[in-house]
Amino acid sequence: VCKNNIVVANANVIVNIPPFGNPAITGAAIAPSSSQGPTDDGRIKPDITGRGTNVYSCDDSTDSSYGNSTGTSMSGPGVAGSLLLLQEHYNNLNSSFMRSSTLKGLVCHTATDDAENPNVSAIPYPGPDPFWGWGLLNAKFAAQTIIDAQTNAAIVEEKILNNGEIYSFTVNVSGSEKLMATICWTDLAGQLQNGILNSTTPALVNDLDIRITDSDNNEYLPWKLDLSNLPYAIKGDNIVDNIERVEVDLPTAGQYTITISHKGIIPGTTPGSQGIQEYSLIVTGSDLTTTLSNGENELSDFLVWPNPAKEMINYQFASQS
């Protein structure tokens, strides 16, 4: 199963639409025909769930016929259409489109956890699972996060991690809602498992990490599947997924440090060289304000040219590691 795509599950979702007020989910369950994860190496798949049962859509009876259909052939297009609208919304505000990793990270970050809705037939524990993925697509929350990022009430950023770099910054929260931070990246192609069935070797090439630390130095770790106790998820060092989400469920008001780093060496384009990894960062919470931490990088080289300069300068740096 590919690392960088978005795998969509099919759920039977019942929505109550009142004459006034907001629609509400009154029932939902994964369709029996919807494929389940995880992958052989333990990655969280599917990624997201959409409504795909008894969906009114066009059919192949005539040129103009419609009918009810069921399957991921319904949930997949529904999710894809929502993602296109999110791209349009982002472009309207930023005059550019999101990277695929940003879009994927955003919808997984803002998904409605199936365990948090009492009307959903789900795994009775929070976090991702191999049936729903990260949960039901929540396009409203995703769109609001894009809006909130305009006023620094949320973070939706596209960044680059250099080999050996540790990127760290702090956020101040009021403590009135959950603090969540997600990174997602388009990973390089892994080793071909030619002729090997059910290989548990991680397909991940560049293993990025995200952590949240509070003022008492308590460290919060990302979700990962508990392969010894499926379908449940636990929090720990995730070495297989190219999306990681960390949560502080009941944050106290104050300052939290978010740190992004990586294991091993980020390979370059030529054998033996060192490279970079583009990644996307999404953070939501309450009344976020951000500041970069001091000394977030220790550098072995820092080059600036030309010198003297008139209008433009170039710079290049390398970390000590």
Regions found by a protein language model. Give the residues of each.
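Structural recognition of the beta-strand scaffold that forms the well-ordered cores
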Residues: 6-9, 46-50, 56-57, 75-76, ...
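Catalytic-core environment of secreted peptidases
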Residues: 11-24, 30-77
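Acidic glycine-/aspartate-rich tracts in secreted/extracellular proteins
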Residues: 12-15, 53, 112-115, 186-188, ...
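Hydrolase catalytic cores
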Residues: 49-119
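Short proline/glycine-enriched turn/loop motifs at strand-loop junctions of beta-rich domains
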Residues: 52, 185, 205, 318-321
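C-terminal edge strands of extracellular/lumenal beta-sandwich accessory domains
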Residues: 102-104, 167-169, 198-204, 211-216, ...
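Secreted peptidase-domain scaffold signal
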Residues: 128-206, 214, 273-291
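Surface-exposed, proline-anchored Ser/Thr-rich loop/turn motifs
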Residues: 295-320
